Every structure is written in C-alpha cells, then in structure tokens.
C-alpha cells in the first residue's frame, strides 16, 4: 500500500477535489493548498513526497514557489510536477528550467498523472 503524501497546489477547488479523489483511490495521502503561502507552510510542516503545482496562483506564481524550493537545501530535492493550462512550448521549457520534474497541461487524464507520479 502506498501512503506517500502528495501536496496539491491549485486555486480551483474542482481541480483539487478531482485530483484528491483520484490520488486517494490510488492510495496516496493528499494535502491541499490554494495559494503559494499555504503551500509553502504545508511543505515545511508536512514534508510531502511530491508536489503537484499549478502555475497561475493567487499571491504569486507556482514558478516563484518552485524557484524558492529549489534554492533551499531542505526542499531542493522535492519532486515537482507542474499542472497548468499554459501550453506554449516556451512555458513548458521555462517550467522545466526552473526545476519541474514533469510538466502536464490541463486538461489531463488523472490515470496518466498517477502513472507519472
């Protein structure tokens, strides 16, 4: 049984809810944040195994959060998958350059995401 914790960071409740349900069915433990401030606090407090991160968030971008995480020793090795509506090739390259381990565009298939995790 997989009990790894996944932090879902998205400002849209419906996306977080859909991801949480799909991941819990695959035996992941999920925690959620709707902005980068909440996300950073959960990362520090809960130490999730992986981060699913939207690009466009209130209070700052997912890229800003990822850049901060990759600079800090405590969090630099945390795997990050960007989940975003930004589909342009330049956006994909920018997300990967900042430190994303994978980049998935919305809409996406939950089963494919779980396979990538």
Indicate where each model-derived feature is located:
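The short loop immediately C-terminal to the conserved phospho-acceptor aspartate in CheY-like receiver
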Residues: 12, 55-56, 82, 86
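The feature encodes the CheY-like receiver
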Residues: 16, 58, 76, 88, ...
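Charged docking surfaces used in two-component/phosphorelay signaling
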Residues: 17-25
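Short hydrophobic/Thr-rich beta-strand motif most characteristic of the beta2 strand and flanking loop
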Residues: 27-36, 42
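Active-site beta3 strand of CheY-like receiver
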Residues: 46-52, 57
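C-terminal output helix
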Residues: 108-117
């Amino acid at each position: 049984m997989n009990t790894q914790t996944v932090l879902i960071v998205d400002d849209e409740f419906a996306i977080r809810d859909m991801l949480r349900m799909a991941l819990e069915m695959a035996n992941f433990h999920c925690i959620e944040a709707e902005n980068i401030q909440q996300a950073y606090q959960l990362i520090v407090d809960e130490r999730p195994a992986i981060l699913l991160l939207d690009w466009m968030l209130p209070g700052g971008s997912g890229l800003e959060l990822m850049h901060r995480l990759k600079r800090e020793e405590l969090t630099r090795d945390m795997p990050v998958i960007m989940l975003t509506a930004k589909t342009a090739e330049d956006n994909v390259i920018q997300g990967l350059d900042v430190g994303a381990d994978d980049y998935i565009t919305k809409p996406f298939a939950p089963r494919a995401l779980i396979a990538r995790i």
